Amino acid sequence: MRLILFALFIFVTSCNTDSQIIINKDEIVPLSIANNFTMTYTDSTITRSYVSGKTHYDFSNTELNYSEFFEDVELIIYDDDKTSIIKSDYAIIYNSLRFIEFNGNVEITTTNEESLTASQLFYDTENEWLFTEEKFQYSDKTNKINANRLDSNRDFTDLVTGNLTGSINVSD
């Protein structure tokens, strides 16, 4: 009798464990969670950029290999002649794709007095390309642009927009 109860107990608990494994199989759990986190990117011992946020979830353990940043997200990009700062409420970095998505109160400012605001912005880090399908505002020392779509290099020297309004200075 004891042997039958023991076998029944093992059978029930093993089935219960298997069902928990099956239930949790598709659940995506971050590899780590950090507060007040900063990630630095270097090239040949030179700091090229860093990204920070109040909360960071690392999902590099997933096939998509991404990180999420929440609250006061800031990406600072250093060049030889200028620095660019991108701020937002939320960002997701797709590490293997070399791609960043910014959402909520996105602001770009540069040391060349350029600024851009949007509700959403995508940044291709490999090609240094910015784009959005949302409304945005861009301004520099001589131009002020409001438009519905942006497709531009990070220096704003090759800028394509949709439904443009505002003022642009054109030189001959």
Give each language-model segment a name.
Residues 1-172:
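Mature-chain termini and adjacent capping regions
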